[in-house]
Amino acid sequence: MKRHTEELDALYELCSREKMELTESQYELLAAYALLLEQWNKKINLISRKEDAPVVIKHVFHSLLMGLFHPFSAGEKVLDLGTGGGLPGIPLAIAWPETRFLLVDSTGKKIAACQAMIKELGISNAVALHSRVEELKGLTFDTVLSRQVAQLEQLCAYTYRFLKPEGCLICLKGGNLEEEIRTALDARHAHHGFPSTIEHFAISGFSPFFAEKEIVIAQR
């Protein structure tokens, strides 16, 4: 119970500072998810087991920051590609209950953990699916999310076929991204002109734990 309260207090302080409009029940669910993620991580490798920051900051708040740069809307269809332990999809589904999230990963054990957490938390706007990206056919989305370490050009190659016109790919990435962005833009002729533009935003100011971290938005 003490751990839950500590997670809740840390998250409330960060989110309220950024004027994120979350209800008490949403804070409760986000803190509960952080604890579930840690519990599941002891059984399955979902996140690093040598964390240098609290999970609620490094993973939950980190995911929520996407919504500051891309306000999710009611009815928006979002694909979380390579979700792992439900990141960023589960925190975002809690914070934006009218947006629909499909969480996909090629590792069955990780998806089983996501399905169990979604069920325990009572989240109705998120579905976890065991699938490879190549097997997703006939589906289109307004937005694709990724926390994968894959190069941006590779992520664009994976996702352009799923994006609706005016859709975007949002990535949480780290390091010097100039060359990675230039490579993705140079290769857009191979991906039906995607991305048309790429914006990137440093997020180190939100927390010392996000040094050299950025949010990248590639527009269809």
UniProtKB/Swiss-Prot annotation:
Molecular function GO terms recorded: rRNA (guanine-N7-)-methyltransferase activity
Location of this chain's protein in the cell: Cytoplasm
UniProtKB keywords: Cytoplasm, Methyltransferase, rRNA processing, S-adenosyl-L-methionine, Transferase
Residues involved in S-adenosyl-L-methionine binding: 82, 87, 105-107, 133-134, 147
Coiled coil: none
GO CC annotation terms, alphabetical: cytosol
Keyword presence, Oxidoreductase: no
Primary role: Specifically methylates the N7 position of a guanine in 16S rRNA.
Stated family: Belongs to the methyltransferase superfamily. RNA methyltransferase RsmG family.
Protein name (database record): Ribosomal RNA small subunit methyltransferase G
Taxonomic classification: Bacteria, Pseudomonadati, Chlorobiota, Chlorobiia, Chlorobiales
Underlying gene: rsmG
